[in-house]
Every structure is written in C-alpha cells, then in structure tokens.
Amino acid sequence: MKQILLSILLASTLMACCNKACCDRNANTQNPIMPIVFVDSEDHTQVIYLTDYLPQVANFDKLVFTTEPGCQVVCVKDGMLTLTCDNRLSVLTAEDTESGKKYDIPVTPKAEYQVGLVTKSYTDSTITIEVLNKYNDLQLLVLWQDTRATACVQYTHPEAVITIEPAWRESKGRSFIRVYAMADGKQLNDLLIPLENGKVVNNVAQLTRHDDQAQVLYSLMIDRFYNGNQANDWKMNSPEVLDIVDYQGGDIAGITEKIKEGFFNELGINTIWISPITQNPWDAWGHYPFANGNKYDSTKTYTKFSGYHGYWPIYTTEVEKRFTTDEELHEMLDVAHKHGLNVILDYVANHMHINSPTLKAHPDWHTDSILPDGRRNFELWDEARLTTWFDVHIPTLDLERPEVCSPMTDSALVWLEKFEFDGFRHDACKHIPLNYWRELGAKMKQRYPNRHIWMIGETYGDPALIGSYVKSGMLNSQFDFNIYHTAIDVFGKPEQSMKRINHTIMESLASYGSHHTMGNISGNHDKCRFISL
C-alpha cells in the first residue's frame, strides 16, 4: 500500500502546467501565490481576505487593484476585498504603491474537473504542452512566479508552445511556471513546471528538501522512537499508570543518533515530523474508559496516562525535560540539515493543560465547557468544533479573542526564532478559528520573508472545510484523510472497487489543484497500522 500511496503522491507532484498567457518579474519565491477559487458556481461574488493571498504585505491601504473584463473589484475595506467574476479564468493584479511590487493572483471559477493537459517536451527556449481534447473555447493562463507572462502562448491543436522568456532563463535558483486552463466550462488540470537557474528541472536528483511538492514525511513519536540519552529517563512508576502509557525513554538525542547512522536517508524520506516537545504535566491524567457515562467493568484494565505523547502542553515555549535540552535540540536540527533532511515540529495551539500557569493567570482564556442548553461541551467535533474540549483536563483556548490569539501566535513563532525548524505540523486545525491562522501566517511571512517554512495541518472533514485553511497566508497543506480512509477501505476489502479511490483522488485534484501539496498518508499516531485492520 505504501508504494501505491507514494505513486499517488508522485503523480500529483509531477502532474503540472498550461494556458494562454503573459508575465513581469518578481523576486524569486518558493511558494507562488495560490489562486482564488470561487467556491460556488452559481454565486459570482466572493469576499476575499487579502492576508490569505498576500500575507507579506503589511499595509493593504497601499495596494491598487486592477482586473480583466468579466472580473471586478466591488469594494476594499478592513483588509477584505469583494470580487465579482464570470465563469472564466481571470487575474486580479495587486500593485503595492509603496514598494512598487506587483502580484498577479489567478482567479478560477468552480467547475467540473477534467484532465486535459500534459507537458510533452521542452528545449532551452520553449515548453510544449499537449492538449488532450479538442475544445471550442480554451482559455490558457501562464504565470512565472507571481506575474502573468508577457508573451502569448502559441496554440495550434493539439499543442501549445510556451516561450521561455529571457528573464526566466536568467533567474537564479528555483522558480516556477504555472499554467491554468478552462475549456468549454470545465476546469482543466493545472500544470507546475519547476526551473532551476532558468532551465526546466528534468531529474528527481535536482529536487531538494526545500521543494514543497517533493516532501516525503516520516512521522515519529519521540518517546517511542529511540533512547539516546538515558540521563533524562524518568518514568512515573505509578500504580495508576500502566507501563505501556508511561514514558519509555525516547528522546531528541536518539533521533540525532539515528540521523547520523543514516536511518532516515536509507528510507528515502526528506522530512521528519516529530511529536510535540513542549513541557507536559509531571503527573498522570485521564481515566479510561469512564468518559461518556461508561460504567466500571471489572474485566477491563483501567489506567491514567502520562503525557508521553506531548499533546497536553503546560508551557507553549519550553521543552519537555524528558525529551531534550535546548543544546540537544540545536544539535539534532543541525545534523538533520547536514544530512539533507527537514524537521517539522508538531505544534498544539488548540488547547493547554488545565494546570498551565497561563490558564492559572488567565482563567477566562478558554471556551465554556457547558453549552447554552446545559450539555457538556466535550468531543462535539462538528457541532461545536471551535469551542469543544477534547477532555476535562485540556480546555480549548478561545482563540477568536484577539487578546488570546495574539500571544498564542507569538508562542508558536518562538520555535522558529530560537531553533532552525523547517515548519510545523499543526494539531486539530479545524478546531482553531481562521483568524489564528491568518495572524500566524502574516507574522511568519513578514518576520521571516526569506526563510522557507512549510506548514501542514490536521483536519477531518469535506474538501471545502479542509481547503478553507490552505491559502498562501495560512497553511501550505493539510493531510488528505479522505483519500486515506477511501484507500484503507479499497485496499483492505476485496469487495471494494478501485473506482472509489479514483473518484476521491479526482475530487481532491478538483478541490486543491493538480500540484497541491496535500499529505497522502499510510497512517499516523492516531490510526491503527494497515496490517492490523
């Protein structure tokens, strides 16, 4: 199954690019602006949060907007823009009158998805794209970096030829040509063509850990991975805690040792996702399975739990002493980078432990554990997704309030300020309001404009909900649990049809784009291993 899912990942990585188009040159950037996608095919008006697409811009009052025929800016107010567009591809251009920079943002309508473009061949000066079907009305839009191309694409069915302009050929480092297409009311697959020093990237050996579309993750839970420093071992050894849910000794020093041994390089991965490293409570919490009114059963084993997993933060900016010191963490990150590996940190923003000094000092910073109708607000994942508590000892933070949101986004950035992490895996994203992600994304882009930081989130839900968090100014990616759950059924049950997974993959491509970086996984710490299902 791992090989099949990797093939899916590579297919979405390599499937990229074409349209009729034009471009100016902006500074080289690793993450081109994501397109504005109208979410409703019937409603031609949409309100846009500018920070979702231009988080690097500090003052939106300095922006001047222009559009193409069929697309119109209705109003700009309080960092929001109201846009109307017909069912055609368009471009919203934002010019910063203060810096002189221009940004071209693709605008795509919601439409039926169809695979219609493939890259066919290239030379040093041209790229040829094959259009798979004959269309009556074909629109092609080509951008290099965040600017529309200046020369039109030459299209004679079945081929469209893009001229690689002098500015593209003279660019240093990695840049991208993007192609968007509409045909006869259908949304065609978009294409992404990476360039290195102005030449088409044609070999996987040219891909590095900094290429978002080439991320291959290895997830590990620190306490259960490898013990590299026995001096920091400290079990609870409590009669209330079964040994299996006590600390086992894994630590950051153990990860460093395995990196040096070549364990991760031999696996062929380029990004290590480590579990949370913030300080958790010293004592045991939780008492399975008394939740939800379960009665005591003498035939079952009951236990409290240690915080070995890391998801009960007492402090949001201090390391768990059982796992590491600052010095050991710096060493691990340095060694990882020398071995060509990213390290992303699992970060918990949704909640804190009830004994956190932060909540002791600000007891009103969490949401209410009782709903207005008197019910307990626990594990109501969809009904009360922004306020529900995961458990009685980990209150959900009220991040819709600015006085709570602002310091919590600053706490997340401490890990980038103090350490050379390459990004975050964010826990429980759908339970955190969008204003948190917008503030975090804007602060990150403005404080670290030249640093490559990649963020992937955890959200269970439909593509619309999952995709609402994936914007240039929020998350780069989310795990695609819809593909995961479908794959588990299809690969694990002989009676299931492969058509199901094909449908789910096509739905993801239509929702997130053909070169999205959504995470296709074979499992994680919340899921049983496939072999045990």
PLM segments and residue spans:
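C-terminal motif of bacterial Sec signal peptides marking the signal peptidase cleavage site
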Residues: 15-16
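Solvent-exposed, low-complexity, repeat-rich "mucin-like" stalks and linkers
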Residues: 32-62, 117-137
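Active-site-proximal helices and loops of the catalytic beta/alpha 8
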Residues: 35, 341, 411-413, 417-521, ...
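Low-complexity, Pro/Ser/Thr- and charge-rich linker/hinge segments at domain boundaries
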Residues: 38-40, 108-124, 197-218, 224
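Short, solvent-exposed loop/linker segments at beta-strand-coil boundaries, enriched for Pro/Gly
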Residues: 64-74, 144-150
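A short beta-strand micro-motif common to beta-rich folds, especially ectodomain repeats
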Residues: 86-98, 175-181
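Extended acidic/polar, glycine-enriched regions
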Residues: 155-210
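Substrate-binding/active-site clefts of carbohydrate-active enzymes
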Residues: 215, 225-419, 439-449, 454, ...
